[in-house]
UniProtKB/Swiss-Prot annotation:
The chain crosses the membrane at residues 33-53, 77-98, 113-133, 178-198, 226-246, 288-308, 320-340, 347-367. GO terms for molecular function: metal ion binding; ubiquinol-cytochrome-c reductase activity. PROSITE patterns: CYTB_CTER, CYTB_NTER. Changing V98M: In strain: Isolate A-0V-3-A. It comes from Crocidura caspica (Caspian white-toothed shrew). Its main location: mitochondrion. It is a multi-pass membrane protein. Disulfide bonds: none annotated. The lineage of its organism: Eukaryota, Metazoa, Chordata, Craniata, Vertebrata. This is Cytochrome b. Component of the ubiquinol-cytochrome c reductase complex (complex III or cytochrome b-c1 complex) that is part of the mitochondrial respiratory chain. The b-c1 complex mediates electron transfer from ubiquinol to cytochrome c. Contributes to the generation of a proton gradient across the mitochondrial membrane that is then used for ATP synthesis.
């Protein structure tokens, strides 16, 4: 008799995705981040749901309701900090996941890659709107500054900004709609993640060598289920340590001051995971130019498959490309640091240099280096 997991309509889907899925035998721990992102998303949805039970999206009571959650709700402080630091964990996993894709040439699976970039945009939008909800100083001014960027769009800009605000400034209407969007977007992210997996399972996973692995496949369960569980335990222990020992390490002290439209904080900056893009935005003196650079800094991921000139898929056997990849990582870390610094010399110049290097490496240096490597390997 055939096993129920292979015949039952619902079990069949689970079976072909997580149990009998043929996986390459040599995928390393860099392939763990997909499952870790799934765990992050589930954690965020659950903690967010419990927070939403006690939160009020009104300018008068929003800040107080978050304080109430931390002080009066059973384990409210734990739920709130799990949610806030869970977002940081989410982005750490996201950046590592994208970095893995770039290093090993996983972007050659076009549909999977492009949906992944859409997912990145959706998660960034969700995180931005979530940061506005506690209605602290940085929430209010962050929302004001970032939404105001849309006014750089010619002709319709100002109308668009006021339409998003629901008035002539960031106020009650803005907070209410941001809460609504922040609630719905994670479910859209979950649906997109399902499509992401669907397309991935059409082709099967890539592997570190970048070579076809059809001749050497192993079942996902038990080999990679146990490996994913280990990864999950490590991530959960890291998140728990962060939440229980230094929950405010990644936050901004300004956000413990209630929002005040009459008092601008000295340094307006987003959460750490947006600082690299914020630094690129600030490095261009023109408003529209800065906004375009900001959007392109992420959108550029979509054209990476078109810039692949190497005859090999992975960077595993391409030392020159490897060096460039790590220079790009260092450049992004530099941008992240600059994004958190005040707008003054020498930070402005460093930011401009790092921004130029970021686009140069991706658009020109990487493809040219790959072509040189082809010549050196006589391919």
């Amino acid at each position: 008799m055939t096993n129920i997991r292979k015949t039952h309509p619902l079990m069949k889907i689970v079976n072909s995705s997580f149990i009998d899925l043929p996986a390459p035998s040599n995928i390393s721990s860099w392939w763990n981040f997909g499952s870790l992102l799934g765990i992050c998303l589930i954690t965020q949805i659950l903690t967010g749901l419990f927070l939403a039970m006690h939160y009020t999206s009104d300018t008068v009571t929003a800040f107080s309701s978050v304080t109430h959650i931390c002080r009066d709700v059973n384990y409210g402080w734990l739920i709130r900090y799990l949610h806030a630091n869970g977002a940081s964990m989410f982005f750490i996993c996201l950046f590592l996941h994208v970095g893995r894709g770039l290093y090993y040439g996983s972007y050659m699976y076009l549909e999977t890659w492009n949906i992944g970039v859409l997912l990145l945009f959706a998660v960034m939008a969700t995180a931005f709107m979530g940061y506005v909800l506690p209605w602290g100083q940085m929430s209010f001014w962050g929302a004001t500054v970032i939404t105001n960027l849309l006014s750089a769009i010619p002709y319709i800009g100002t109308n668009l900004v006021e339409w998003i605000w629901g008035g002539f400034s960031v106020d009650k209407a803005t907070l209410t709609r941001f809460f609504a969007f922040h609630f719905i977007l994670p479910f859209i992210v979950a649906a997109l993640a399902g499509v992401h997996l669907l397309f991935l399972h059409e082709t099967g996973s890539n592997n570190p060598s970048g070579l076809n692995s059809d001749t050497d496949k192993i079942p996902f369960h038990p080999y990679y289920t146990i490996k994913d569980i280990l990864g999950a335990l490590i991530m959960i222990s890291m998140l728990s340590s962060l939440v229980l020992f230094s929950p405010d390490m990644l936050g901004d002290p300004d956000n413990y001051t209630p929002a005040n439209p009459l008092n601008t904080p000295p340094h307006i900056k987003p959460e750490w995971y947006f600082l690299f893009a914020y630094a690129i935005l600030r490095s261009i003196p023109n408003k529209l130019g800065g906004v375009l650079a900001l959007v392109l800094s992420i959108l550029i991921l979509m054209i990476i498959p078109l810039l692949h000139t190497a005859k090999q898929r992975s960077m595993m056997f391409r030392p020159m490309s490897q060096c460039l990849f790590w220079i790009l990582v260092a450049d992004l870390l530099t941008l992240t640091w600059i994004g958190g610094q005040p707008v003054e010399y020498p930070f402005v110049v460093i930011g401009q240099l790092a921004s130029v290097i970021y686009f140069l490496i991706i658009l020109f240096i990487m493809p040219i280096t790959s072509m040189i490597e082809n010549q050196l390997l006589k391919w």
